[in-house]
Amino acid sequence: MSGDGEWRQELDEQQLEDVRRLLLAVREADGRPEVEPAGALPGEFDGGEHLVACVEGEVVGYAHLNTTGNSFGHQVAELFVHPAHRNRGYGAKLLQALDERAAVGFRVWAHGDHPAARKLALKTGLERKRELLILHVDVEGADWPEPILRDGVSLRTFVPGQDEDAVVRVNARAFDWHPEQGALTVEDVRADERRAWFDEDGFFLAEERGEVIGFHWTKVHEPTPGRFGGERVGEVYVVGVDPAAQGGGLGRALTLAGLRYLASRGLRQIILYVEGDNAAALAVYTKLGFTRHETDVQYGR
């Protein structure tokens, strides 16, 4: 296995298309990552460093290293091997390259918790450091009541160009413990506003005395081969409540508002991501009908 000889901070046009074709092939086989046939790669591949692995001129693997690190200070990596070239040791070689390049304490994602990833982690001495659960609910048969708000609190939808700062402020307070979500910036929100999936009508804000105290940002995923029967899927993307405003069922009310909105769009399935050790959130979502569907794992030393 060879590559372009070095880690790169940017991919040239040809490398970008080569990586896109590889990721599309991976998506066809595994259902992820969510990469489009044209345009920019998904946001998780922005910045950082890239390594493209080739055999006889054919791209067989790709690794990305987020050198900035998450809010806990861990550099985070992703690696992919083309489905037609698996079980030939390329994943191990990419992981070795990451191990040599990344800072001590780096983490690497294994989406879907595939047996091959578990085997590779065990072989190389990596341990499970984090589990991110994908929960799922069928809309048909769900009976989600109208949200009930405590006195003085009202709901409205997000206004682009007006509410970014307030959302980021609440998000930072609500997720100061979270390695990725807590790092959300105004620039990140504005970047998502430019994405095709963004829908301000599905972005709910809770206000009290004119101040935003919580939000529920929903998302709709276009059909992805190999996942959810090839249907469009709604997502409880982010629910954040200012710690000073917690209590009185505000988080539940915001969640219900988003679920009812997604159901009104004719979606038959809704998902969400939750940390595997967040027992309180798991209890809330279980009561709303969600069950475990998939698990993403971060490995590290």
Curated annotation (Swiss-Prot):
Alphabetical keyword list: Acyltransferase, Repeat, Transferase
Catalytic activity: 1D-myo-inositol 2-(L-cysteinylamino)-2-deoxy-alpha-D-glucopyranoside + acetyl-CoA = mycothiol + CoA + H(+)
Binding-site residues, acetyl-CoA 2: V239, G240, V241, Q246, G247, G248, G249, L250, G251, R252
Gene: mshD
Domain of life from the UniProt record: Bacteria
Domain N-acetyltransferase: 6-151, 153-301
Sites where the protein binds 1D-myo-inositol 2-(L-cysteinylamino)-2-deoxy-alpha-D-glucopyranoside: E180, K219, E235, Y273
Family stated for the protein in its record: Belongs to the acetyltransferase family. MshD subfamily.
Role played: Catalyzes the transfer of acetyl from acetyl-CoA to desacetylmycothiol (Cys-GlcN-Ins) to form mycothiol.
Pfam families hit by this protein: Acetyltransf_1 (PF00583), Acetyltransf_7 (PF13508)
Matches recorded under NCBIfam families: mycothiol_MshD
A GO molecular-function descriptor: protein-N-terminal-alanine acetyltransferase activity
Organism of provenance: Amycolatopsis mediterranei (strain U-32)
EC nos: 2.3.1.189
PROSITE patterns: GNAT
Assembly description: Monomer.
Binding-site residues, acetyl-CoA 1: L79, F80, V81
Protein name: Mycothiol acetyltransferase
GO BP field: mycothiol biosynthetic process
